[in-house]
Amino acid sequence: MRQKVVFPGTFDPLTSGHFDLINRASILFDEVILAVAASPGKRPLFSLEERLALAKEVCQSLPNVTITGFSNLLIDFMKEQQATILLRGIRTGSDFEYESQLAAMYRRMMPEMEIIFLPPAEQYAFVSSTLVREIALHGGDAGQFVTPNVAEAIKAKQLQLAQS
């Protein structure tokens, strides 16, 4: 049986830390589904379509990674994908605490689910989409925390926001 893992997130924007986890997951699993959440309640900087396009570009060198958007309950999405393994990145103790609570809830709703927590490589342990957005929204250069295509998209978004 092929091992399939779902790595969900808003990915607004996709960071170098995310890519590190995706790349490592692509080595560990036969198939990785990067599930980009619509998350309208979070008021994302990039639209779902933009986030999907950026993720596809970032992951183009990984043939066993599929990028897809979703707006339903993660449990339902996983069932649609016939996946029972969930990958979550954890950077800090507070991430672990929050993710452990989510894991307990997910397991209650889908008992056959396995949840894997994967810490980032050390150089990405402090990188988060929230911090990258904050840098970008204040006119800073977040390029060292994202891939070149995402850095260009952030610069374009900065110009767009400055003109509005």
UniProtKB/Swiss-Prot annotation:
The keyword Nucleotidyltransferase applies. GO terms for molecular function: ATP binding; pantetheine-phosphate adenylyltransferase activity. Its cofactor is Mg(2+). The record marks 18 as: Transition state stabilizer. One of its GO terms (biological process) is coenzyme A biosynthetic process. Keywords: ATP-binding, Coenzyme A biosynthesis, Cytoplasm, Magnesium, Nucleotide-binding, Nucleotidyltransferase, Transferase. It holds the Pfam family CTP_transf_like. Substrate binds at residues 10, 42, 74, 88. InterPro entries: Cyt_trans-like, PPAT, Rossmann-like_a/b/a_fold. It catalyses: (R)-4'-phosphopantetheine + ATP + H(+) = 3'-dephospho-CoA + diphosphate. Its EC number is 2.7.7.3. It is found in: Cytoplasm. Its main location: cytoplasm. Pathway: Cofactor biosynthesis; coenzyme A biosynthesis; CoA from (R)-pantothenate: step 4/5. The keyword RNA-binding does not apply. GO terms for cellular component: cytoplasm. Coiled coil: none annotated. ATP binds at residues 10-11, 18, 89-91, 99, 124-130. Belongs to the bacterial CoaD family. Homohexamer. NCBIfam families: coaD_prev_kdtB, cyt_tran_rel. PANTHER family: PHOSPHOPANTETHEINE ADENYLYLTRANSFERASE (PTHR21342:SF1). Reversibly transfers an adenylyl group from ATP to 4'-phosphopantetheine, yielding dephospho-CoA (dPCoA) and pyrophosphate. This is Phosphopantetheine adenylyltransferase. It comes from Tolumonas auensis (strain DSM 9187 / NBRC 110442 / TA 4). The lineage of its organism: Bacteria, Pseudomonadati, Pseudomonadota, Gammaproteobacteria, Aeromonadales. The gene is coaD.
